Every structure is written in structure tokens, then in C-alpha cells.
């Protein structure tokens, strides 16, 4: 079976923020160094590029992980039922997303809301998500290893996701420390529902994996967007800013 997941394009209006980035509250009073050298900008760019590539790699692994689980652990009838619900039934998707660990971390829905975000809140917004998924991936791997007969390829992909999330978390901390300094008081909530993987009901098990996969992909896309916005704040004239504006106008 081939996994058919529509790629979400959430929060399009948030992209409009880039053209008004310097109008944000607290931007001018943030910890950014206005006298950064070319070397500093290259360092930032390298870290952002690596972090974004890692995030994209994780999303690719996530797709393959769910596909491998579906092929080896789920009946074709149940698979088709859930895929149709995720693709066609928005109420079902909303129900799934309200179960994500970070649903309380509100993402702006329009330009007015985005302009109200204090610039120095970005470390908390990003690290809260990253910490949650870093810990959740460890829990997922522990649970999968405890399930008798779990396919080796499923466990191997879960290991790869866990390793890359840990690496992405380290790069994210480095980026945010360079720009803002140390970040404290991160929201340490994790994804809920993984215990359903141990349930005897096949549908509960598969839904738990679908929910994990979908929420992880949405959060990683959000983090990638925040990386772009931060990169523009560090270097307003970067190609990233131009690409975001082009994406918004398309």
C-alpha cells in the first residue's frame, strides 16, 4: 500500500509577517547584534540550513515510518478507512489535532495576531515544540520495542526519527542561544496517546500512529517557518526573505 498524505499548508497568512518583520513589537529591543560580521551571518545561515534540512529529513522518515507500519501491522480495509478520513473529513483532522501535545501553543491565524507576538517569545515557541517531540520520540521507541512481533523496519525507522530529532534539538538550541541567549522555562509537555499502541484494538493502534505522524509533520513545518522568519530577522536582505515573499504571493 502507498501512503497518501496530503501535505498541509497551514498558516499561510503568517508568511505575510516577513514584509512587516521590522514592525514587530520588541524587535528593536531584542538581543540581536546589529553589528554582526559576515562571518556571523554565514554561521547563522549554516545552522539554519542544517536545521531545516534535518527537519525535512525527519518529515520524510515520518512518512516512510507510517507507511511501513501500515504495510506490516494494519489490515488493508482499516488503512483505507483511516486514510480517507484524514484526507476528506476535516472534522476528523481537527479532532486529531486537538489531541496533539502542543495544541495550547497558539499559532497566529492572521497578520494582526502575528504582529502581537513579542519577538523574544520565539525561543519558547520553538523549543517547547522541539523538547516535546524529542521526548515523545524516545517514548515511542520504548513502546514499539516492548510490543511482541513489531516489525524490525518499523523500529529501525523510529530509531532514525529519534536520532534526527535529538540532533535537530541541539541545532535549534545553538541557533536560539546565538540570537537570544539561554532560554528558560520551556513548556515541557509531550504528545499524548502513544499508550494506545499497546491496545488490543487494531484501530486504536493505527489511529495512535496516524495522530503521531500527522502532528509531528505539522509541528516540523511550523518550526521550519519560524526558522525562516528568524533568519530574516537576522539578515533582512537574505534570499530566504525573498523566497517567503514569493511563496506568499503565489
From Swiss-Prot:
GO cellular component entries: extracellular space
Gene3D superfamilies linked to this entry: 1.20.1250.10
Keyword Glycoprotein listed: yes
A biological-process GO annotation: positive regulation of lactation
Entry keyword set: Disulfide bond, Glycoprotein, Hormone, Secreted, Signal
Signal peptide residue numbers: 1-29
Stated family: Belongs to the somatotropin/prolactin family.
Name of the molecule in the record: Prolactin-7A2
Organism expressing this protein natively: Rattus norvegicus
